[in-house]
């Protein structure tokens, strides 16, 4: 009987995950994340606000803004506009629009552009599944000069379904990994990213690791505030990293 119940729960979760987008589509929702270094010390926070959702011919366009906060939660004055295209079976991160949303004062006269493959994440995924590689090209221009950087996102795999608990709540998640690498002239860089996404919420936790698998930094969802909420939930203590896979 216990085995049957566990199997039923797994099937229900799989059905729910395939039916819901792996991002928040409720206008007015605020998602607060804390960033930590390798030792678990909080280094900063970000607050993502869902500004609006707009139906288009391509799908649902979700517009958000990401505000940077210091470790105590005080705004630093830096913010970034982002958008995600939610289609029937996947979501596409609008990287080029994100670059255009960077405050011009931070670019020192440079313009940025992104081309290449769509950065998409499907909604229905199975542990062990491999996702297509992504090839991107970042173009940096200033006056009459320009440089292009090729970015490869490879080794994209669905690792597991896990339940993750943070100070924001408990979430059924799909766990993904991918490898980022780029090379320019004699300089190259590579890192790994592991991310947990929850249906209807989006990113719950992510970890950045060296190519050898050593943790460098992490980010975790610590509070959710809906548009009709009176008060924002209390965040976790500033010195702690609270999440863990259950």
PLM features: residue spans?
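Sec-dependent N-terminal signal peptides
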Residues: 6-9
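N-terminal signal peptide c-region/cleavage motif recognized by signal peptidases
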Residues: 14-16
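Extracellular-facing segments of soluble proteins and assemblies that are Gly/Ser/Thr-biased and enriched
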Residues: 90-142
């Amino acid at each position: 009987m216990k085995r049957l119940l566990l199997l039923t729960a797994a099937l229900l979760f799989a059905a729910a995950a395939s039916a819901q987008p792996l991002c928040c589509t409720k206008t007015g929702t605020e998602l607060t994340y804390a960033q930590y270094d390798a030792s678990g010390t909080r280094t900063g926070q970000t607050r993502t606000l869902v500004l609006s959702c707009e139906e288009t011919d391509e799908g649902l366009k979700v517009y958000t803004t990401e505000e940077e906060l210091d470790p105590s939660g005080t705004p630093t004055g830096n913010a970034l506009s982002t958008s995600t295209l939610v289609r029937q079976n996947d979501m596409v991160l609008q990287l080029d629009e994100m670059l255009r949303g960077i405050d011009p004062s931070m670019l020192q006269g440079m313009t940025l552009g992104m081309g290449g493959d769509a950065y998409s994440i499907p909604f229905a995924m199975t542990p062990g599944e491999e996702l297509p590689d992504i090839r991107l090209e970042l173009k940096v221009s200033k006056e009459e000069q320009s440089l292009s950087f090729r970015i490869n996102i490879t080794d994209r795999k669905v690792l597991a379904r896990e339940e993750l608990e943070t100070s924001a709540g408990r979430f059924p998640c799909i766990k993904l990994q991918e490898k980022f690498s780029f090379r320019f002239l004699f300089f190259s860089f590579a890192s790994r990213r592991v991310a947990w996404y929850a249906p209807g919420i989006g990113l719950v936790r992510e970890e950045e690791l060296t190519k050898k698998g050593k943790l460098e930094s992490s980010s975790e969802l610590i509070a959710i505030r809906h548009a009709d909420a009176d008060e924002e939930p209390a965040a976790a203590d500033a010195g702690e990293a609270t999440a863990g896979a259950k």
